[in-house]
Amino acid sequence: MSPQTETKASVGFKAGVKDYKLTYYTPEYKPLDTDILAAFRVTPQPGVPSEEAGAAVAAESSTGTWTTVWTDGLTSLDRYKGRCYHIDPVPGEDNQYICYVAYPLHLFEEGSVTNIFTSIVGNVFGFKALRALRLEDLRIPIAYIKTFQGPPHGIQVERDKLNKYGRKILGCTIKPKLGLSAKNYGRAVYECLRGGLDFTKDDENVNSQPFMRWRDRFCFSAEAIYKAQAETGEIKGHYLNATAGTCEEMIKRAVFARELGVPIVMHDYLTGGFTANTSLSHYCRDNGLLLHIHRAMHAVIDRQKNHGMHFRVLAKALRLSGGDHIHAGTVVGKLEGERDITLGFVDLLRDDYTEIDDQRGIYFTQSWASTPGVLPVASGGIHVWHMPALTEIFGDDSVLQFGGGTLGHPWGNAPGAVANRVALEACVQARNEGRDLAKEGNTIIRDAAKWSPELAAACEVWKEIKFEFPAVDVLDKKKK
């Protein structure tokens, strides 16, 4: 090792401030299979070299501080420090770089997403030498992945529990999201499930407010589930939101859901926190409950291109912490999400192994070993005319959540559910027959509407509804 990167006690202590790059920029370093690797989008302040900025990120997110301290001599920092080992300029940007940092596995507590993020996306994001900083991707080594339980059950086990194969899972978020009484809420759940949906969902805003306490909602929703199951012969469920102000209260709600015999509960994993989410995931596996995950607050963290954390990192963190579903954007609906980027983190959720893919924004190869996959959920501003595109984009292993696209049907909730189920079945049949959903999608929906008055009415209501705004977070492209 070169003298300038040597930090062992034998060097001796010399007080003062030195450049980060003398210790933490190590372009000769070859990452180990056990290292956690991070790709940061770094925007230095004017006059700060990229090497110093990248080294500062490595230092401040691992063992470094702003000055030399004598206690450095009491340990081997070369064993524990983060290393900025490679820097690429961002195409099309004058002062922006992708800095790759390797972290030794010794730095992190086993099975703790909370500890990973406390270090890697902690105080360094407020560092004055940086104008902006964004964590674009992480490579989690198998040695660390195996310290996590991961999703409670995974895709195949969920399909077996529900006895649903060969198509997407179809759901609906109950609206209005706030203000319904528990009994009226249960009525809406029943009507949607009876009409052909597999699941209904608590809106993420619904916890236990004065107008509808959680226990009442759980009871009326369970009654709706059992009634719809008896009438349709299909397994049904409702995502009962167990998110609460304390972990103890959250688990209490999950316990009550299990006692009711329902198949699934729900958690807001970002607002609730990773520690709470991991605890709930463990409870769900131990007690046979599926776990639906909502990502409320994600856009605060991931929407800006130059600062924060990309959702692909949050998706990987969720697969570690645990969840059987997670909302992942729609591409075609009202919420942010470019197609290639969205499919990139959909791959990270479902597949056992993903390669580096510049076209999908994947910076590292990632193996998940035996960790179960997570079903991506498309939700937000989608309706029957979107069904061909959603079927083509996401494939069978996904969940479609139509809120307004079900409850906004002019004939009521059950006909809205019928319209969505007919549209889905028509698209699946057309795909299985070899038809091109991208080119023939509208024709497929119109043909199905000829024998389904519910679908015909839905088509008429939403024929002009589009959300054509450019995505904020897009792939980097070179300036012409």
Swiss-Prot record:
The modification N6-carboxylysine is found at residue 201. Binds 1 Mg(2+) ion per subunit. One of its GO terms (molecular function) is monooxygenase activity. Its EC number is 4.1.1.39. Substrate binds at residues 123, 173, 177, 295, 327, 379. The active site is at residues 175, 294. It catalyses: 2 (2R)-3-phosphoglycerate + 2 H(+) = D-ribulose 1,5-bisphosphate + CO2 + H2O; D-ribulose 1,5-bisphosphate + O2 = 2-phosphoglycolate + (2R)-3-phosphoglycerate + 2 H(+). The keyword Secreted does not apply. It is found in: Plastid, Chloroplast. The disulfide bond which can form in the large chain dimeric partners within the hexadecamer appears to be associated with oxidative stress and protein turnover. Keywords: Acetylation, Calvin cycle, Carbon dioxide fixation, Chloroplast, Disulfide bond, Lyase, Magnesium, Metal-binding, Methylation, Monooxygenase, Oxidoreductase, Photorespiration, Photosynthesis, Plastid. SUPFAM superfamilies: RuBisCo, C-terminal domain, RuBisCO, large subunit, small (N-terminal) domain. GO terms for biological process: photorespiration; reductive pentose-phosphate cycle. The modification N-acetylproline is found at residue 3. HAMAP family: RuBisCO_L_type1. The basic functional RuBisCO is composed of a large chain homodimer in a 'head-to-tail' conformation. In form I RuBisCO this homodimer is arranged in a barrel-like tetramer with the small subunits forming a tetrameric 'cap' on each end of the 'barrel'. Heterohexadecamer of 8 large chains and 8 small chains; disulfide-linked. The disulfide link is formed within the large subunit homodimers. RuBisCO catalyzes two reactions: the carboxylation of D-ribulose 1,5-bisphosphate, the primary event in carbon dioxide fixation, as well as the oxidative fragmentation of the pentose substrate in the photorespiration process. Both reactions occur simultaneously and in competition at the same active site. PANTHER family: RIBULOSE BISPHOSPHATE CARBOXYLASE (PTHR42704), RIBULOSE BISPHOSPHATE CARBOXYLASE LARGE CHAIN (PTHR42704:SF15). This is Ribulose bisphosphate carboxylase large chain. It comes from Trianthema portulacastrum (Desert horse-purslane). The gene is rbcL.
